[in-house]
Amino acid sequence: MSSITLIGTGNMARAIGTLAVAGGNTVEVTGRDPSKADDLAKALGGGTTTGTWGAVPVGDIVITALLYDGVVPVVAEYGDALAGKVIVDISNPFNATFDGLAHSEETSIAQEVAKVAPSSTSVVKAFNTIFRQVLEKGRPDVFFAGDNAQAKVDVGAFITSLGLRPLDVGGLKMAHWLEGMGLVTVGLAGNGVGHWDFALGVTEFSG
């Protein structure tokens, strides 16, 4: 099993944390508001601990469960405290009208995180194509991208421990397109599907 630290105390932190505890992983919760972190840790149970904001995380895998515009600044703020860790960015940088990405260049939040993280840190993009309520109700495919092979093995094993299927889409540059998939998911929720209780996945056909 894995040891993870959740930076953030919102809905996605709660959803991932719940599955992580159920999967037998060691979980730490960290938030700017210590009382919210304490409350989430107690709600998750399973020996979940509370960390100190900015301190070295307990988890080998650090999940930044934050709004997109806070991810890069927080990673920069943590600095060397994240050395040797695997950072998992789950954010979606949607624009204000939810019909485009907030950045115009062919980049991603995960790629920008890699620029400010310590050189010994690996960055993986994952979970951004899944709505919180889907994690609570179902077992969707989890697309992920990253450059470090061992980091992807570790993240894949963690995803599997949640009862989900990890699907590797390639190097970290693919994180840009995963963010685009997140946007497509929102478009489907508002149009073709018409509700939020679904997830994108892969169906394989033989013969």
Name these PLM-found stretches:
Residues M1-A43:
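NAD(P)+-binding Rossmann beta1-loop-alpha1 motif at the extreme N-terminus of oxidoreductases
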Residues T5-L6, T64, F144:
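Hydrophobic Val/Ile/Leu positions in short beta-strands of Rossmann-like dinucleotide-binding domains
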Residues A15, L19, V116, F158:
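Rossmann-fold NAD(P)-dependent oxidoreductase module
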Residues D38, A76, Q111, K115:
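Active-site phosphate/pyrophosphate- and oxyanion-stabilizing loops and adjacent acidic/basic residues
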Residues A41, G45-V86, I90-T97:
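Rossmann-like NAD(P)-binding element
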Residues S91-Q133:
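Rossmann-fold NAD(P)-binding glycine/threonine-rich loop
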